[in-house]
A protein has these predicted regions:
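Long, positively charged amphipathic alpha-helical accessory segments at protein N-termini or as interdomain linkers
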Residues: 6-7, 76, 82-100, 110-262
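Short loop/edge segments at beta-strand edges and connector loops
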Residues: 15, 102-104
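Basic side chains
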Residues: 47-52, 103, 166, 256
Length: 262
């Protein structure tokens, strides 16, 4: 299903694996070329942002990781996560005729519930990136979530009533991401994508709560409120607090809506 000029140069498939990101890092360390895609039907040790567990059942999800060799500075690698979210929205619209939204920086949502998570990791020096891996876990055809998750997570199938062809969806995402990524490497910043991202931003012009550190561990002095105004060319969330706009970087904070997750 991949395009002829696809950014994806090679696909490695697994029935079961500990984590596609772990495998991606192993391959990158061994010199694997950029554009190699690792796909698994099931993960036994999938992880989300800040080390959180990601449940990866067989037969219902899409779990994949791209091996990347970015030419941008290490500080700009986090922008890859935002582009993956854009690619996820594009693939969902193309394959399922539904346009999701993005909860900055790395969650793609339908009707306020999460359908995927994205985790980008890198090996770098101060001014140089050796490699990065961009992993994405997608709730595609999952039919049921347990009580602790059902208020903030859903699947494409539960949201749309349409079963996802996982191979076609994987190809649609891989091709969409490749186009965004090539442009990012060419430009060096996210200027070309700010408008598109802001249109899909679920929290735009809404009040958000900013947790400096982990949400679970936040003390009152580590919590602030503001209005989300969009992103800048570096991928920071622009938050208006007491009339002045401050850029907030994704590695430092977690964002929640005033009414809950979004």
């Amino acid at each position: 299903y991949l395009e002829e000029e696809s950014f994806c140069q090679k696909v490695e498939c697994h029935d079961s694996i500990d984590s596609t990101n772990i495998r991606g890092k192993q391959l990158a360390e061994l010199g694997e070329a950029e554009g190699t895609l690792i796909v698994a039907d099931r993960q036994t040790a999938g992880r989300g942002r800040r080390g959180r567990n990601w449940i990866s059942e067989s037969g219902v999800g899409i779990y994949m990781t791209y091996v990347l060799r970015p030419t941008v500075q290490p500080a700009h690698v986090s922008g890859i996560t935002l582009l993956a979210a854009l690619a996820m929205c594009e693939a969902t619209y193309q394959e399922c005729d539904v346009l999701p939204q993005i909860k900055w920086p790395n969650d793609v949502i339908i009707d306020g519930k999460k359908i995927c998570g994205i985790l980008t990791e890198m090996s770098s020096e101060v001014q140089y990136v050796h490699y990065a891996v961009m992993g994405i876990g997608i709730n595609a055809n999952k039919e049921k979530f347990d009580e602790t998750l059902k208020d903030k997570a859903t699947s494409i199938y539960l949201s749309t009533g349409k079963k996802v062809n996982r191979a076609k969806f994987t190809a649609a995402f891989a091709d969409a991401f490749g186009g965004y990524y090539r442009r990012y490497m060419q430009d060096g910043d996210l200027s070309a994508f700010v408008e598109e991202y802001d249109e899909l931003l679920a929290n735009k012009d809404k009040e958000v709560i900013i947790y400096h550190g982990m949400v679970e561990d936040a003390t009152p002095d580590k919590i602030s409120r503001g209005i989300a105004r969009g992103i800048d060319k570096d991928g920071a969330l622009l938050v208006e607090i007491d009339g002045s706009v401050t850029p907030v970087m994704s590695g430092e904070v977690s964002i929640r809506g005033v009414q809950g997750y979004v």
